[in-house]
């Protein structure tokens, strides 16, 4: 009996052809292609980097997002029934292979590429940049610089949104996985900066403001700027709307008993101004 995670070469090749056709529609190969590698901790909002890249390339860029290939596994529905929230673990080998195959196919033709990642390690960006430069690509790295409290809340909000859409496949990002990237990203970015593999390393906030460019300040490492933004204190005014949105979604999903819900409520209570003490009524003489 075949393993439910298995798929045939024909199934894979057929889907690969469809993906390549879809991704390259209205896109043109160029003489001097550029590959943009994206980084940032989970929940930081890496999709917002696409706006800056689209503007830079006049929209002529192919976005390769590993997550979008997971549901393409030929047996995805059966795997969901069997593994539910753990399904991602069983379809990731498929999505990884699809990502690699698409990059290989498009790099040979010279399309501008956006390749999503996190920056949790330095190995993958170095290998990817080296491989693409062998095909005469210019390689750049654009990274989200977002306070860690904002990105962690982003992972919770994303999960609650996914849960409302499909409880069986909604998968939370463990806080530990988020925090590992937060801890490693500044040092990893400094290492990547020193390799000289990237013609430009940029840091952007969620508003699309460029906070750093190695092209503009080549002697300065991105590490300090990123650490400062990751650890920046966030005002109550800045964080309150996010907390309220998450609380509302968690109530709708009936997640009031979760530790995350209790933590959200505690944080919201801490942002409320203290209640002024009730003044004591002065005693009148003889009473």
Swiss-Prot record:
Composition skew (Pro residues), residue ranges: 273-287
Keyword tags: ATP-binding, Kinase, Nucleotide-binding, Plasmid, Toxin-antitoxin system, Transferase
Region ranges (Disordered): 250-287
GO molecular function, one term: kinase activity
Reactions this protein catalyses: UDP-N-acetyl-alpha-D-glucosamine + ATP = UDP-N-acetyl-alpha-D-glucosamine 3'-phosphate + ADP + H(+)
Superkingdom of the source species: Bacteria
Family matches, as SUPFAM superfamilies: P-loop containing nucleoside triphosphate hydrolases
A Pfam family this chain is assigned to: Zeta_toxin
EC annotation from Swiss-Prot or TrEMBL: 2.7.1.176
Binding site for ATP: 40-47
Quaternary structure (record): In the presence of the epsilon antitoxin, forms an inactive PezA(2)PezT(2) heterotetramer.
UniProt family annotation: Belongs to the zeta toxin family.
Physiological role: Toxic component of a type II toxin-antitoxin (TA) system. Phosphorylates UDP-N-acetyl-D-glucosamine (UNAG) on the 3'-hydroxyl group of the N-acetyl-D-glucosamine moiety, yielding UNAG-3P. UNAG-3P inhibits MurA, the first committed step in cell wall synthesis, which is then blocked. Phosphorylation is inhibited by epsilon antitoxin. Part of a postsegregational killing (PSK) system involved in the killing of plasmid-free cells. The zeta toxin induces programmed cell death.
Name assigned to this protein: Toxin zeta
């Amino acid at each position: 009996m075949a393993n439910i995670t298995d798929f045939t070469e024909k199934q894979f090749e057929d889907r690969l052809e469809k993906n390549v056709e879809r991704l390259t529609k209205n896109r043109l190969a160029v003489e001097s292609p550029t590959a943009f590698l994206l980084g940032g901790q989970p929940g930081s909002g890496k999709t917002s980097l696409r706006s800056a890249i689209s503007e830079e390339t006049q929209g002529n860029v192919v976005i390769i997002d590993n997550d979008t290939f997971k549901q393409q596994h030929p047996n995805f529905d059966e795997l969901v029934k069997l593994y539910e929230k753990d399904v991602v673990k069983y379809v990731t080998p498929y999505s990884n292979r699809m990502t690699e195959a698409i990059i290989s196919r498009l790099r040979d033709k010279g399309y501008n590429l956006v390749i999503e990642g996190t920056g949790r390690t330095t190995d993958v960006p170095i290998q990817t940049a080296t491989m693409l430069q062998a095909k005469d690509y210019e390689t750049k790295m654009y990274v989200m610089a977002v306070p860690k409290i904002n990105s962690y809340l982003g992972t919770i909000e994303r999960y609650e949104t996914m849960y409302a859409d499909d409880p069986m496949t909604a998968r939370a990002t463990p806080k530990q996985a988020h925090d590992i990237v937060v801890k490693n990203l500044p040092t990893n970015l400094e290492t990547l900066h020193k390799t000289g593999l990237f013609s430009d390393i940029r840091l952007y906030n969620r508003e699309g403001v460029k906070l750093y460019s190695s092209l503009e300040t080549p002697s300065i490492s991105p590490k300090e700027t990123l650490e400062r933004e990751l650890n920046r204190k966030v005002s109550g005014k800045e964080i309150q709307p996010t907390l309220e949105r998450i609380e509302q979604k968690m109530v709708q999903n009936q997640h009031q008993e979760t530790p995350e819900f209790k933590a959200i409520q505690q944080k919201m209570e801490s942002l409320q101004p203290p209640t002024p003490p009730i003044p004591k009524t002065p005693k009148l003489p003889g009473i």
